[in-house]
């Protein structure tokens, strides 16, 4: 596991606030395009999200060995709506990081419970994402368009790589699992 993911896990709320603070610089005339370029480069190579379907999320859950449920950090930090907060399903590399972070916030759940939570929240017209840090997928989050930081970065500030589609996301996740076993 890359050392960046544990560091990010411990300071996630601070990073989300920092992202939203710094991204406002992209609206300044002289530094805006440079800021947008840097943010897109960072999202592409270091940390960002993939928009996934409910079916993709279910396949990823089926392939995962351990799952944990915790609060959606975006919704926990920004409080822009009244949708449920307990919607982040930590997978794979993220499980180890977040279990060390706080056993009070994250609890281990079954695949059936994870799917039930996905379906329950899907009816609220939310978006499903899988997040990556340094190429490691670490969480499936079900968030809303008013709180989701990657969604807001893309829609409000034109940071295209903050949240992208990848038709091969399930295959990419399975490949990551295979490589972790070797």
Role assignments for model-derived ranges:
Residues 53-55, 126-129, 155:
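Glycine-rich, charged/polar anion/phosphate-binding loops
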Residues 69-84, 137-152, 179-182:
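Local cysteine-cluster metal-coordination motifs and their immediate loop/turn environment
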Residues 1-97:
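General detector of N-terminal leader/presequence modules that precede the first folded domain
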Residues 77, 86, 107, 111-132, ...:
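Extended surface/linker regions that mediate inter-domain or inter-protein docking
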Residues 153-160:
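Short cysteine/histidine-rich zinc-coordinating motifs and their immediately flanking basic loops
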Residues 100-108:
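Hydrophobic protein-protein interaction segments
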Residues 131-135, 160-182:
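Ferredoxin-like iron-sulfur electron-transfer modules
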Residues 61-71, 118-140, 174-177:
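Immediate flanking context of iron-sulfur cluster ligation sites
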């Amino acid at each position: 596991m890359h050392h960046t993911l544990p560091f990010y896990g411990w300071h996630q709320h601070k990073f989300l606030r920092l992202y939203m603070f710094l991204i406002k610089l992209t609206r300044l005339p002289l530094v805006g395009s440079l800021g947008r370029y840097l943010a897109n480069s960072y999202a592409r190579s270091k940390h960002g999200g993939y928009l996934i379907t409910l079916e993709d999320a279910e396949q990823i859950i089926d392939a995962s060995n351990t799952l944990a449920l915790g609060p959606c950090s975006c919704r926990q930090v920004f409080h822009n709506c009244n949708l449920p907060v307990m919607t982040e399903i930590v997978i794979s590399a993220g499980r180890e990081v977040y279990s060390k972070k706080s056993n009070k916030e994250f609890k281990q759940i079954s695949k059936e419970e994870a799917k039930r939570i996905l379906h329950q929240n899907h009816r609220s017209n939310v978006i499903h994402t899988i997040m990556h840090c340094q190429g490691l997928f670490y969480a499936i989050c079900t968030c809303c368009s008013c709180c989701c930081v990657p969604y807001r970065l893309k829609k409000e500030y034109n940071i295209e790589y903050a949240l992208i589609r990848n038709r091969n996301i399930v295959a990419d996740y399975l490949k990551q699992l295979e490589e972790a076993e070797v």
